[in-house]
């Protein structure tokens, strides 16, 4: 959602429109009023006149306490930020001729990343003539994905990128 900058919010005398669709402090529709009439109504109840929908024809303004409105908006923004989850992509590098113990160590590290909620990019770099045996690398990647299938799903199947083959694993959604 876009945040409203302080200088972009039209309140009281900063309202540019001549006519406004007015909403009262309780949320009831008052109707289309001139800017002067709307300001007088807001001053009578000692509140502010705030444009809430500037793109509407005519713009929609509401009689409210602007300080309270701004505070509520900031509170909602903070709540939305809390709910956002930052997903990192961690990379595990393997070799097509990896030994079993090394494979298990790399697997343990990858599982740790996945349980934390991070995505995992498992890549194999082919050096020299090893590029002629891509199927060996593909088997290693498929074995890695198979070992992690209880906590992760394959987001991207094994794919070549230059001299590298990689697979993307994403943690399974918790229920």
Swiss-Prot record:
Annotated SUPFAM superfamilies: Translation initiation factor IF3, C-terminal domain (SSF55200), Translation initiation factor IF3, N-terminal domain (SSF54364)
Localization terms from the record: Cytoplasm
Entries under PROSITE patterns matching the protein: IF3
Keyword set, alphabetical order: Cytoplasm, Initiation factor, Protein biosynthesis
GO-annotated molecular function: ribosome binding; translation initiation factor activity
Primary location class: cytoplasm
HAMAP family (UniProt xref): IF_3
The protein's name: Translation initiation factor IF-3
Taxonomic source organism: Staphylococcus aureus (strain Newman)
């Amino acid at each position: 959602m876009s945040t409203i900058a302080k200088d972009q919010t039209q309140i009281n005398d900063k309202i540019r429109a001549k006519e406004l669709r007015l909403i009262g402090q309780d949320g009831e529709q008052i109707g289309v009023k001139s800017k002067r009439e709307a300001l007088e109504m807001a001053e009578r109840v000692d509140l502010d006149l705030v444009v809430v929908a500037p793109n509407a024809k005519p713009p929609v303004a509401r009689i409210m306490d602007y300080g309270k409105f701004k505070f509520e908006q900031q509170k909602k923004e903070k709540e939305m930020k809390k709910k956002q989850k930052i997903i990192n992509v961690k990379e595990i590098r393997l070799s097509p001729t990896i030994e079993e113990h090394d494979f298990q160590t790399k697997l343990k590290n990858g599982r740790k990343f996945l349980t934390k909620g991070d995505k995992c990019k498992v890549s194999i770099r082919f050096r020299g003539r090893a590029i002629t045996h891509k199927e060996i690398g593909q088997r290693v990647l498929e074995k890695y994905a198979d070992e992690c299938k209880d906590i992760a799903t394959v987001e991207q199947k094994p794919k070549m990128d230059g001299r590298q083959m990689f697979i993307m694993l994403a943690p399974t959604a918790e229920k």
